[in-house]
């Protein structure tokens, strides 16, 4: 266009010819721009296909012909019996002969440094992985025999990876629960601290969340996940760093309400935060994949302080 102005001034082309050239240039370049967009979408489609293909090729949790033991309600006795475990494609074992027993209604904290294996305990208890050796038992039954649906309905869990879905706050709390009543959802939200921020929004529990809870703070996401774990009133609560993203005041309030709510249930808290030790009576310290200490928290003060020195990455 700039060069065309000089050509018009020199009388070599007309104004109409310049305008026609600009129009034709735009039409010639438009398909190239669309081609670039198409290539971008192709790469996105290929990435999505690979993810879906990996999901479809994964081993089924319910293989055809497999029969499970139905346990609609569990008492909450948890036992690790000489459990050894290594993650796929890892040469170093995450757990090495871990053994302990937690009685129904007992309140226990599992502590350890980064990479010690304490979060691996949670994943094995939920059946997300199977031990290489030994057994994980609930109510004296190997969890590999228990129907996975029954197992997870009886264990309310909060893991470090917070997963929220596109939907309302109510739907994110109630997902996985069997026909939850509004009263159950509201009570779980109150205990977890969801009520504190939802009550101020005009949409309330119908507030729409983006995928993975985009737009919410880390503490708000954790509160919704904790409410999800509580809504079914499971006999076992498994909480892995449930308040790590909350501010001090919110954490204090949640702990106070949890202490009352956990009465009569088996509570397993995996943490490096000493504030959560108010919820428990017993401490198990995991060191390098083994049980380094196990006993009443009052006699394990030195060990717990040492174990609480790092953040979890196991």
Segment roles from a protein language model:
Residues 2-6, 50, 241:
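Transmembrane alpha-helix boundary and packing residues in multipass membrane permease domains
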Residues 22, 29, 152:
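Conserved catalytic core of two-component sensor histidine kinases
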Residues 1, 41-44, 54, 58-61, ...:
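An intracellular "coupling" helix at the cytosolic face of ABC transporter transmembrane type-1 domains
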Residues 1-22:
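A hydrophobic transmembrane-helix motif
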Residues 28-55:
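Cytosolic ends of transmembrane helices, especially the final helix of ABC transmembrane type-1 domains
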Residues 61-73:
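Pre-NBD coupling/linker segments of ABC/ABC-like ATPases
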Residues 71-314:
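ABC-type nucleotide-binding domain
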